[in-house]
């Protein structure tokens, strides 16, 4: 019974850590805490945001942080909500799991002539790996269900972010 109880407790701890890492991803983005955001990933990481125009690729963690920060730093504010986590552990490898989660991303771009709001709904498939530093996202795939509002907001925010970097 003790071994079984220990295994069950460890599985619950793993679930909590995986879920927290996915939430920290969203919090890091919204706080513009790129260290927190980057710490969510392995290095390298496979990132597939092709539904939003960023081609799927295996990149360094720093490259992913650079791409995402450039895309989002130009927004006035964002709020990324990641609910409904379903975690499936690899039956052949206790150090691997997949976390499926919903995504609700709100973006505010004050002063845009094309509309200040851009809303995005969808989901993520996060392939997780247990590392010496805890559970990390090894592969992230974004799936978009629908979007509403200023669909040029991301491109506008990138322009603003790049202009701010140059000045």
Question: Where are the regions a protein language model picked out?
Answer:
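Hydrophobic face of alpha-helices
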Residues: 19-22, 65, 121
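Short, low-complexity N-terminal intrinsically disordered segments enriched in polar/charged residues
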Residues: 1-27, 31, 35-43
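A solvent-exposed, acidic/Ser-Thr-rich amphipathic alpha-helical stretch
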Residues: 34-104
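A structural signal for alpha-helical segments
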Residues: 13, 56-59, 116
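A beta-strand edge to alpha-helix "cap/lid" segment located at domain peripheries
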Residues: 2-6, 73-167
């Amino acid at each position: 019974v003790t071994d079984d109880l220990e295994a069950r407790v460890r599985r619950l701890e793993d679930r909590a850590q995986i879920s927290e890492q996915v939430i920290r991803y969203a919090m890091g983005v919204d706080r513009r805490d790129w260290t927190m955001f980057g710490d969510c990933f392995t290095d390298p990481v496979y990132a597939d945001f092709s539904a939003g125009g960023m081609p799927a690729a295996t990149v360094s963690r720093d490259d992913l942080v650079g791409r995402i920060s450039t895309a989002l730093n130009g927004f006035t504010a964002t709020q990324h909500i990641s609910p409904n986590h379903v975690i499936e552990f690899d039956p052949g490898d206790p150090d691997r799991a997949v976390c499926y989660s919903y995504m609700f991303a709100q973006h505010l771009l004050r002063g845009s002539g094309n509309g200040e709001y851009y809303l995005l709904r969808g989901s993520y498939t996060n392939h997780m790996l247990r590392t010496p530093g805890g559970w990390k996202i090894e592969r992230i795939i974004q799936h978009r269900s629908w979007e509403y509002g200023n669909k040029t907001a991301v491109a506008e925010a990138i322009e603003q972010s790049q202009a701010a970097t140059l000045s």
